Curated annotation (Swiss-Prot):
This is Tryptophan synthase alpha chain. The keyword Amino-acid biosynthesis applies. One of its GO terms (molecular function) is tryptophan synthase activity. One of its GO terms (cellular component) is cytosol. The keyword Lyase applies. It is an enzyme of class 4 (lyase). Keywords: Amino-acid biosynthesis, Aromatic amino acid biosynthesis, Lyase, Tryptophan biosynthesis. The gene is trpA. Pathway: Amino-acid biosynthesis; L-tryptophan biosynthesis; L-tryptophan from chorismate: step 5/5. Belongs to the TrpA family.
Amino acid sequence: MNPYAQLFSRLDAVNQGAFVPFVMLGDPTPELSLAIVDALVAGGADALELGIPFSDPVADGPTIQGAALRAFESHTTPDDCFELLGRIRAKYPQLPIGLLVYANLVYVRHIDGFYEKCQQAGVDSVLVADVPVQMCAPYKAAADKFGIDSIFIAPPNGDAETLKQVAELGSGYTYLVSRAGVTGAETKAGMPVDGLINTLREFNAPPALLGFGISEPAQVREAIAAGAAGAISGSAVVKIIETHHQNPEHMLTRLKEFVEGMKAATNR
């Protein structure tokens, strides 16, 4: 059983959904980003979704773009990120770890080389944000070769054929987007999504985690009530880092408290 299947099975047994925070590796510095991961896990994060800083993040709003800029300012490179991933994996051997990246980051290392590096660092899944499921073949082949789950986005306006492909080609979990546009806590998730979740279920898709605009516990409760296996929150987490990174101790406390509140909302 892969790490995500184990996670969902364990959570189902105690009637909980998953809460998965997203942060950018290297934000605000490589060492502080390790402390941030510790705070997220201490707060109850069920899995991690992590970014590698990229200069043109087309799916991201200003908050996560700012995280990438801070990571660049601290001279964080992709190699640094893989080193951080290895350290996170060594510390948390059972925690599902996913990467959310852009195609250029994968391509510049050659697709096989990138996924091999992910395997060596202990990464469980990769979502390539700017590669739609219809164009995923070389990425999916490399992921399968190195035992990495391929995560695909189920768009809110996706037709049945797209959702069927997401279901058939994806593994680990399905990233269900609650609204069109870019990431950002400023624009709330657009409910309801129960119709999309039901369609994905009919196609035997991996469990759906709802993302984009998830910033408060009520939205986590709504996502789980609609049938999602959990929720992903990125911009709201990164906003705490943006606001408080000059005071690391306070920032880490706020991050832990935020995750505790979001995780508490996953009780079914």
